[in-house]
From Swiss-Prot:
It comes from Haemophilus ducreyi (strain 35000HP / ATCC 700724). This is Fe/S biogenesis protein NfuA. Involved in iron-sulfur cluster biogenesis. Binds a 4Fe-4S cluster, can transfer this cluster to apoproteins, and thereby intervenes in the maturation of Fe/S proteins. Could also act as a scaffold/chaperone for damaged Fe/S proteins. Belongs to the NfuA family. [4Fe-4S] cluster binds at residues 156, 159. Binds 1 [4Fe-4S] cluster per subunit. The cluster is presumably bound at the interface of two monomers. The keyword S-adenosyl-L-methionine does not apply. Its cofactor is [4Fe-4S] cluster. It holds the Pfam family Fe-S_biosyn. Homodimer. Keywords: 4Fe-4S, Iron, Iron-sulfur, Metal-binding. It comes from the Bacteria.
């Protein structure tokens, strides 16, 4: 299938072995299904379930692995681009991990307008880092003199660390990604300190 060349989903050897072990206990010809609930939204969640042969749809895309296949529905497919499934063992035991960087926002083309590519990087790389502080950044506009105007929300609003975060973290990251298209970032939010501020 054409789409399989574009969309890449990787399952580590450990995770493949784990799936094979689980599937041996199921009916013959049972595979796995990888899906996204609420794809393209901040509340997107990925999951893996068993997929009996009679549950495969014509519109599904099949990814073949040793001893089993992973099926992905048409709606979830673009949001699972570059997804990685691993089976990690540590002192606390073993668990399956599923990283899908594009689940909350569809992957965009390299030749998409600059503002779309910039927003994609903010949503998939910057905001996940800020989420640990309960904060987020929204791209408001890109000025003619190549400055990205950003609005901080959540725990970042009124945070005394914003200048440091903005200049050192986000600006550095975005300039490294877009060295010719961007000169810097500016903050549009009037930072009023409130009880929800992290620092």
């Amino acid at each position: 299938m054409e789409q399989q060349e574009i969309i890449h989903i990787s399952i580590s050897e450990a995770a493949q072995a784990h799936f094979r072990c689980l599937l041996e206990q199921q009916e013959p010809n049972t595979h796995i299904r990888i899906f996204v609930v609420n794809p393209g939204t901040p509340s997107a969640e990925c999951g893996v379930s068993y997929c009996p042969s009679n549950a495969v749809e014509e519109t599904d895309t099949e990814f073949k692995f040793t001893g089993f296949s992973a099926f992905v529905d048409e709606l979830s497919l673009p949001f699972l681009a570059d997804a990685e499934i691993d089976y990690v063992t540590d002192q606390m035991g073993a668990q399956l991990t599923l990283k899908a960087p594009n689940s909350k926002m569809r992957k965009i083309a390299d030749d998409a307008p600059f503002i779309e590519r910039l927003d994609y990087v903010i949503q998939t790389q910057v905001n996940p880092q800020l989420a640990s502080h309960g904060g987020q950044v929204t791209l408001i506009e890109v000025t003619e003199d190549k400055y990205a105007i950003l609005q901080f929300g959540g725990g970042c609003n009124g945070c005394s660390m914003v200048d440091v975060t903005l200049k050192e973290g986000i600006e550095k990251q975005l300039l490294a990604t877009f060295p010719t298209e961007l000169k810097g970032v500016k903050d549009v939010t009037e930072h009023q300190r409130g009880e929800h501020s992290y620092y």
